[in-house]
Amino acid sequence: MADGPRCKRRKQANPRRNNVTNYNTVVEANSDSDDEDKLHIVEEESVTDAADCEGGVPDDELPTDQTVLPGGSDRAGSAKNCWQDDVKDDECDSDAENEQNHDPNVEEFLQQQDTAVIYPEAPEEDQRQGTPEASGHDDNGTPDAFSQLLTCPYCDRGYKRFTSLKEHIKYRHEKNEDNFSCSLCSYTFAYRTQLERHMTSHKSGREQRHVTQSGGNRKFKCTECGKAFKYKHHLKEHLRIHSGEKPYECPNCKKRFSHSGSYSSHISSKKCISLMPVNGRPRSGLKTSQCSSPSLSTSPGSPTRPQIRQKIENKPLQEPLSVNQIKTEPVDYEFKPIVVASGINCSTPLQNGVFSGGGQLQATSSPQGVVQAVVLPTVGLVSPISINLSDIQNVLKVAVDGNIIRQVLENNQASLASKEQEAVSASSIQQGGHSVISAISLPLVDQDGTTKIIINYSLEQPGQLQVVPQNLKKENPAPPKSCKSEKSPEDLTVKSEKDKSFDGAADESTCLLCEDCPGDLNALPELKHYDPEHPAQPPPPAPATEKPESSASSAGNGDLSPSQPPLKNLLSLLKAYYALNAQPSTEELTKIADSVNLPLDVVKKWFEKMQAGQIPGQSLEPPSPGPGSGNIPAKTEEQPQPVDGNEPQEDSTRGQSPLKMTSSPVLPVGSAINGSRSCTSSPSPLNLSSARNPQGYSCVSEGTQEEPQVEPLDLSLPKQQGELLERSTVSSVYQNSVYSVQEEPLNLSCAKKEPQKDSCVTDSEPVVNVVPPSANPINIAIPTVTAQLPTIVAIADQNSVPCLRALAANKQTILIPQVAYTYSATVSPAMQEPPVKVIQPNGNQDERQDTSSEGVSVEDQNDSDCTPPKKKTRKAENGMYACDLCDKIFQKSSSLLRHKYEHTGKRPHECGICRKAFKHKHHLIEHMRLHSGEKPYQCDKCGKRFSHSGSYSQHMNHRYSYCKRGAEDRDAMEQEDTGPEALPEVLPTELVGARASPSQADSDERESLTREEDEDSEKEEEEEDKEMEELQEDKECENPQEEEEEEEEEEEEEEEEEEEEAEEAEHEAAAAKTGGAVEEEAAQQAGSFQQKASGSESKRLSEEKTNEA
């Protein structure tokens, strides 16, 4: 390369060429040349070499000394020597070039911008000779200030090397019929794609790119830069780039963002870690296991999340959830407490963090009780279950007298036994000597798919707290039909009998705590464990959980003790069993007797008395005036009997002896029984069953919920009314059970409930109202995400350890997505009217958006007095919508709803033809085009049509690379097809047909195969494009990112598409080669056939001649 035809130059001793590649780049580094010029860098070197090889180089041609530059440009001295050698040649203009190299006038002249006169005049030689020295590079190859040494006379571009300038003029400004000229300037291009890319220089920003790929698809155009968007909200966010507006600020690091997607990514990522956890949940790295937690004080105006954060920060993580959950959520998801009501002070000392099993925690709170919503953190929708029951206890305890009882009862099926034992030890936590919750059973799903959560809450002293389970309708709450009044412990005898009936009824259904109960899982377990004193009633150990035995044994110590509390609990259980099945079989009675630890004869007699109506009188005993007993009107589906809290009711609500549930009434949260908010001082177990009931009797007497619980607090109600209410509640709870009969007063278990005006309960959420003596109601809302939700049975035993037995008779234990305990606490009954706002803890209301049709929040449904229903989805304090299953936060509720599909797998839009489902409607619309054959998008160059905008956009993003490849492939295919077809002409006529038919068949077959391959590949491309578009649309709709991220994604997609296209092209080429080989083989076979035919013909002729001779 260094030696031209002259061969007079000396080669450098050790030429350094390691910077040759960089030199070309450096030469034009400071020039304005665009990509088109850079495309020809390699051509420049080849042109230079060609120029050197010419014998006579015109003066205007590049001198040979230029060719040395690529080799020795890194060293100024070597360049100088080369120039000096060339000066000695005859073809050089003069011997004074070396002097001119150093002539400052020449250098000054060369620096001038208006050098149009230089080209193509001869003086350019001198100027060029001065160039290398003037523009010498230092050792590292950096260019000096002479970047504009040679300027193009047409476009004023500057070049250091004359070669580059000539090449630029040749390829950009010389016009001919084969070139493509720019209509706005004098540029010419060899390829249309170069011209199209060049046109972007005449437009602002990335307008051209968006125009090409939009194809009319992007309606919203930015007036500043011309960029277009498919969605208006994307344009709005884009305009913030021009305006500089950054409305989103990180509460932790104070960084601001213009795009909600960037803000959401920042918040959900682990990059920004501080004391303020996302979504009210502390980061795992921030959690500590301190023995005490800062006290939380909620004032009416104080924000709730900071308070929650304070409370949560010291909570250690719960035991890890079992591995088989549908979704593995962050560990800290388990704790999402929410402070529900303002104006309530609560100090919550936590022992070693959150719920140390069996540990007793006492906290002092204002007499109103702590208004704190604790979410039952069960993550996932399938077994095993991990439930934190300590929160439930905390809620109930706080509601009672401000003391917080925390009990760890995580019911994982895998470790049920150990956990239940912990629950047993923790269950006998006493608050002021009174146990609040003795145990909670595993959530179970009934055979019909209904789920119940039962929490039995019993206080020794009636004056402390009245717990009225309030029924939350899972779906639409029905008019309040069943009311339950909790009675003072004075009605223990009646209660004990009723407990027996309750137990019997529960036994008939499957008991969550013990498997003995064959009947409904929901009702039986609730009832059995309902026995506060007898909670230990060691029912036969459930196969799923064996730890209940130990707990049962501990709690069973008071089985038949004559003390009133155990009797009362037994009566409640028996009544529950009776409500389930008024006429149990012998086997059922045996199971009931085993569950309540009573002789079979006693249980049988009690049932007989109940059927004869002999026991109702006892149940009708008026409750002690001290304890308030709220009457909840109980209505059976067939025979609804509204009961006014103030009006006594007859004994037989069902037509059978009334059941008195007062002492340990089990109220299904999801079932029709809604405990009136009236508080019963007597220990009353809290039964939360979230089973769906056809009639949601979530409301207590109509007046009770709507009014500030004045009526519910009315304690003068006769016991008879209480019994009726209790019995109705029990029946409603168990009506779902297999053994439940239509005769039962309330069948609330499985049927979807109609919305009740009285009970403002959100769909699919059972609510339990725990009302402290101050008439502050505590609403426990158990949202149910799926139709089948597990039931939790919590048994409160007075001063005794309850027996927890989780009986998974169906073995269908499912995790409850969340259980939110919202407490609307009011200082006094009169103040209850504005129940404290219920803050959705885990986005339960968001979850309900998918399942419920009502946009009413839990608190709205819980409080009939409350203001008009609010949106289901609640905003966090920063105005964002937080996902309750992960750390993501969204700006819009619709984005959150779409995001929830990722957790639930829900695809609401289904194709009516192939039944394929999609998350977004527009995806279904594009999918339908596959069936209809519609292809509204067409490439303006190759005419190819697309049914999906994503496929079209990808095609356009590749700058017609598909079109070019398609044309090349078609040409190649045509050549291959025509090649073998010429052979038949040479063959004899009789063989032409034989030869042509197979070859034609081969070609036809190959063409058909090629078409099929093309169609298959096209379908695959469309499917891939559609999937990619879905991802893009999801990102655009949910989480729009910065422009840079979008570009990177597009580039990656382009690369992937190019790779796929290359693979397809190779595949087609291989197929074509294979086809050619097949044709060659056919031709050979035809030739051999011809040879054989000619041979046979000659042989026949010879034979004829022989015969003639």
From Swiss-Prot:
Main location per the UniProt record: nucleus
Biased composition, class Acidic residues, residue ranges: 87-98, 1012-1066
Pfam families on file: zf-C2H2, zf-Di19
Zinc fingers (C2H2-type), renumbered ranges: 150-173, 180-202, 220-242, 248-272, 881-903, 909-931, 937-958
Cross-link position per record: Glycyl lysine isopeptide (Lys-Gly) (interchain with G-Cter in SUMO2): 166, 175, 287, 311, 315, 327, 419, 473, 484, 495, 528, 752
Entry keyword annotation includes S-adenosyl-L-methionine: no
Keywords: Activator, DNA-binding, Homeobox, Isopeptide bond, Metal-binding, Nucleus, Phosphoprotein, Repeat, Repressor, Transcription, Transcription regulation, Ubl conjugation, Zinc, Zinc-finger
Ranges of Low complexity composition bias in the record: 15-30, 288-304, 1071-1087
Subcellular location as annotated: Nucleus
Span list, region Disordered: 1-106, 123-143, 278-307, 468-501, 525-566, 614-711, 834-873, 968-1109
Any one biological process term the GO annotation gives: cartilage development
Positions where Phosphoserine occurs in the chain: 31, 33, 293, 302, 657, 664, 671, 678, 682
GO MF terms, alphabetically ordered: chromatin binding; DNA-binding transcription factor activity; DNA-binding transcription factor activity, RNA polymerase II-specific; DNA-binding transcription repressor activity, RNA polymerase II-specific; double-stranded DNA binding; E-box binding; RNA polymerase II cis-regulatory region sequence-specific DNA binding; sequence-specific DNA binding
Positions bearing the Glycyl lysine isopeptide (Lys-Gly) (interchain with G-Cter in SUMO) cross-link: 327, 752
Residues modified to Phosphothreonine: 680
PTM: Ubiquitinated, leading to degradation in a proteasome-dependent manner. Deubiquitinated by USP51, leading to stabilization.
Bias kind Polar residues: ranges: 654-665, 673-703
Annotated DNA-binding residue span(s): 559-618
Chain's role: Acts as a transcriptional repressor. Binds to E-box sequences in the immunoglobulin heavy chain enhancer as well as in the regulatory regions of many other tissue-specific genes. Represses E-cadherin promoter and induces an epithelial-mesenchymal transition (EMT) by recruiting SMARCA4/BRG1. Represses BCL6 transcription in the presence of the corepressor CTBP1. Positively regulates neuronal differentiation. Represses RCOR1 transcription activation during neurogenesis. Represses transcription by binding to the E box (5'-CANNTG-3').
Quaternary state and interactors: Interacts (via N-terminus) with SMARCA4/BRG1.
UniProt record similarity statement: Belongs to the delta-EF1/ZFH-1 C2H2-type zinc-finger family.
Name the UniProt record assigns to this protein: Zinc finger E-box-binding homeobox 1
Annotated organism of origin: Rattus norvegicus
Gene: Zeb1
